[in-house]
């Protein structure tokens, strides 16, 4: 028996897309990307061009408006009297608004300059503290009728008003005391307005005295001191009395203050 052998046919090998297809896809991709970039650039150009055209149109309208005003003033052209009056009214309103805005800006600028050059107001007013009956230097309450305009004047240790700017100050004090209270001596009641310099030295600026009274009940009397003095930066002022136990500390009786001139 003769056996026949047939050789199997070779398997077909899968092949990729042809080279021409790859080139086509590559070119198509490049074309699409280029078109997108070109469209974006054209949109930017068109937007800027439209803005420029809008500005030119506004300038042209302004130019036409000004030419129309000139024609109205000269009586030229075919514009009626009513149209000219309306145009003049619009122009006057425009000029009025411009002048008002200019005047407002000028006032604001002058106000800022004046505000920058203006000296800060320095003032203080304090009332006595009842706990100061045992010390000759009167103490002042940090509450109640207590006024300090800014940080350029401070109340130090409850006793002294210290200033941080050199200048002329009006300094004043009122001390109310009981004139017939029993005392060990009949020496007059003395109140002194004193200055403490930045170096620490002290001196009396003003002084007043009042004699005791024999009337009963207690007869209250007041001593007023006040004057203008030049103070250095860092100087302080305080009030000293000979007998603090006689001082009246009711509201408005005893006070102390200063004002920069």
UniProtKB/Swiss-Prot annotation:
Topological domains annotated Cytoplasmic: 1-22
Its membrane topology: Single-pass type II membrane protein
Primary residence: membrane
SMART domains on file: TNF
UniProt keyword annotation of Disulfide bond present: yes
Glycosylated residues, chain numbering: 240
Transmembrane feature ranges: 23-46
Pfam families assigned: TNF
Residue numbers on the Extracellular membrane side: 47-261
Cellular component per GO, a single term: extracellular space
Subunit details: Homotrimer. Interacts with CD28. CD40 ligand, soluble form: Exists as either a monomer or a homotrimer. Forms a ternary complex between CD40 and integrins for CD40-CD40LG signaling.
Function: Cytokine that acts as a ligand to CD40/TNFRSF5. Costimulates T-cell proliferation and cytokine production. Its cross-linking on T-cells generates a costimulatory signal which enhances the production of IL4 and IL10 in conjunction with the TCR/CD3 ligation and CD28 costimulation. Induces the activation of NF-kappa-B. Induces the activation of kinases MAPK8 and PAK2 in T-cells. Mediates B-cell proliferation in the absence of co-stimulus as well as IgE production in the presence of IL4. Involved in immunoglobulin class switching.
Protein name in the entry: CD40 ligand
Organism: Bos taurus
């Amino acid at each position: 028996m003769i056996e026949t052998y047939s050789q199997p046919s070779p398997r077909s090998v899968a092949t990729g897309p042809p080279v021409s297809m790859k080139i086509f896809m590559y070119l198509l991709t490049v074309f699409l990307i280029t078109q997108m970039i070109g469209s974006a650039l054209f949109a930017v150009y068109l937007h800027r061009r439209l803005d420029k055209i809008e500005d030119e149109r506004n300038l042209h309208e302004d130019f036409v408006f000004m030419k129309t005003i000139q024609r109205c003033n000269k009586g030229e052209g075919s514009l009626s009297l009513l149209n000219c009056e309306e145009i003049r009214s619009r122009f006057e309103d425009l000029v009025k608004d411009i002048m008002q805005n200019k005047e407002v800006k000028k006032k604001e600028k002058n106000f800022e300059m004046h505000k920058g050059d203006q000296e800060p107001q320095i003032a203080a007013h304090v009332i006595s503290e009842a706990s100061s009956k045992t010390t000759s230097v009167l103490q002042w309450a940090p509450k109640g009728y207590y006024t300090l305009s800014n940080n350029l004047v401070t109340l130090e240790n409850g006793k002294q008003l210290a200033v941080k700017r050199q200048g002329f100050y009006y300094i004043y004090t009122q001390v109310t005391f009981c004139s017939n209270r029993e005392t060990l001596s009949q020496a007059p009641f003395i109140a002194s307005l004193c200055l403490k310099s930045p170096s620490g030295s002290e001196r009396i600026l003003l002084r007043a005295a009042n004699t005791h009274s024999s009337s009963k009940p207690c007869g209250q009397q007041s001593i007023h001191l006040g004057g203008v003095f030049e103070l250095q930066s860092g100087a302080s002022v305080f009030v000293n009395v000979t007998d603090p136990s006689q001082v009246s500390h009711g509201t408005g009786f005893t006070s102390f203050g200063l004002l920069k001139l």
